[in-house]
Amino acid sequence: MSLPAGNAVGNWLLILTAIFGFLTLIWIPQASAECQTRSIYCYECDSWTDARCKDPFNYTALPRDQPPLMTCNGCCVKMVRHQRSRYEVVRRMCTSQLQINLFMVDHVCMMESSGNGHMCFCEEDMCNSSKNLYTKNGYQHLINIMIIWLIGILLNQLSNR
């Protein structure tokens, strides 16, 4: 395939950017706009009263040796207070137990203004067992945007020749 010369390269750049942008928008729903309505399982515990709830979480332990699971019609939540101190408290639960009026997005964490804690949301079975709720899929969007940006630079350089 040969590239057209001059102004047509700019048109190709615009078309390719639109195609990749559209494909990226198709992939973004994987991050779900709001907590889902289907039922998932979330861990329900507080490290203040249950040492099994602490990080690092032992997700390889037998189910009887893990904190209880509950059915959740929303997102799983993991809250950490007094992060990286001997007073650290980890709480794992479902959004149905929170009175929160925020637009919640899957695999999003909100930090305390002091930087000593955070609250993360996720929507897969037992996802609130993770130390870090960001998944590889969360970084996929950044990688896609970087690829689109690099292709745009390459096409721009080709059009300037």
UniProtKB/Swiss-Prot annotation:
Organism: Drosophila willistoni (Fruit fly)
Tissue: Expressed in mushroom body (at protein level); overlaps with expression of Sh/shaker and nicotinic acetylcholine receptor (nAChR) components also involved in sleep regulation. Expressed in the adult brain and head. Enriched in the mushroom body, anterior optic tubercle, superior protocerebrum, antennal nerve and visual projection neuron fibers projecting into the lobula plate of the optic lobe.
UniProt gene name: qvr
Matching InterPro entries: QVR-like, Sleep_regulator
Principal location: membrane
Function of the molecule: Bifunctional regulator of neuronal activity in the mushroom body, and possibly other regions of the brain, that acts as a signaling molecule required for homeostatic regulation of sleep under normal conditions and after sleep deprivation. Reduces neuronal excitability by enhancing Sh/shaker K(+) channel activity; possibly by stabilizing Sh/shaker to increase protein levels, accelerating its activation kinetics, slowing C-type inactivation and enhancing recovery from inactivation. Specifically affects the A-type K(+) current.
Lipidation (GPI-anchor amidated asparagine): 128
Region (Loop 2): 78-92
Region (Loop 1): 55-68
GO molecular function annotation: acetylcholine receptor inhibitor activity; GPI anchor binding; potassium channel activator activity
Topology versus the membrane: Lipid-anchor; GPI-anchor
Keyword Lipoprotein in record: yes
Disulfide bonds: 42-76, 45-53, 72-94, 109-120, 122-127
GO annotation, cellular component aspect: external side of plasma membrane; membrane raft; plasma membrane
One biological process term in Gene Ontology: negative regulation of membrane potential
Description of post-translational modifications: N-glycosylated probably on Asn-58.
Propeptide residue range(s): 129-161
Domain statement: Consists of a single Ly-6 domain, adopting a three finger fold stabilized by 5 disulfide bonds. The first loop contains a region essential for protein folding or that is required for localization to the cell surface. The second loop mediates protein-protein interactions.
Similarity remark: Belongs to the quiver family.
Carbohydrate attachment residues: 58
Protein's name according to its UniProt entry: UPAR/Ly6 domain-containing protein qvr
Signal peptide: 1-33
Residue ranges of the TM segments: 138-158
Cellular compartments annotated: Cell membrane; Membrane raft
Keywords: Biological rhythms, Cell membrane, Disulfide bond, Glycoprotein, GPI-anchor, Lipoprotein, Membrane, Signal, Transmembrane, Transmembrane helix
